[in-house]
């Protein structure tokens, strides 16, 4: 292979890595809403698997006041976020031995 050809391949690889990093950031910042029970419960989650908001229709829990419902929504979001962080930490710990020595791009996690 000619010297110029190798330089071109390296440049393409760098451009692809930059595009992948940009796409990973866009995906991480994306927000989706999941709904259940005919929209009586909804959850807004980011691409980083962070629960941003939980909404529970008051009719699901009759007799529960608005303040208690808001606290329940916040506690549910916090519990799910805690579980997600624990799964991520466990995955990184388990995969650490497999990926030891590999030069992964910043922010790239295994498994994908």
From Swiss-Prot:
Keyword ATP-binding: no
Function: Binds to DNA and alters its conformation. May be involved in regulation of gene expression, nucleoid organization and DNA protection.
Domain of life: Bacteria
Subunit text: Homodimer.
Principal subcellular localisation of the protein: cytoplasm
Disulfide bonds listed in the record: none
Family of this protein: Belongs to the YbaB/EbfC family.
GO cellular-component term (any): bacterial nucleoid
Alphabetical list of NCBIfam families matching this protein: DNA_YbaB_EbfC
Keywords associated with the record: Cytoplasm, DNA-binding
One MF term in the entry's GO annotations: DNA binding
Gene3D superfamilies: Nucleoid-associated protein YbaB-like domain
Location in the cell: Cytoplasm, Nucleoid
Protein's recorded name: Nucleoid-associated protein PFLU_4577
